[in-house]
Curated annotation (Swiss-Prot):
This is NAD(P)H-quinone oxidoreductase subunit 4L, chloroplastic. It comes from Oenothera argillicola (Appalachian evening primrose). Its EC number is 7.1.1.-. It is found in: Plastid, Chloroplast thylakoid membrane. It is a multi-pass membrane protein. It comes from the Eukaryota. The lineage of its organism: Eukaryota, Viridiplantae, Streptophyta, Embryophyta, Tracheophyta. One of its GO terms (cellular component) is chloroplast thylakoid membrane.
Amino acid sequence: MILEHVLVLSAYLFSIGIYGLITSRNMVRALMCLELILNSVNLNFVTFSDFFDSRQLKGDIFSIFIIAIAAAEAAIGLAIVSSIYRNRKSIRINQSNLLNK
């Protein structure tokens, strides 16, 4: 696969994730867009590791660490969203003011 094609795909994924994160009013959708951003970064790490340093697996190992951290972030984020929904009955970002009761 050509390096430029993979980088363009990663840039598209990153752009879609940023756009969704900026325009999203739903907390779950914002978490999904954040995961999309992290996966585009992982795609870059794996691609550069494969093309430029195929003997050492630094990019692949770093990508595995990012996947593990993203899984923990998603679990914690969904737990927070679930707690907010139980208390506020809404998961819209603009309706949840956590300082007011």
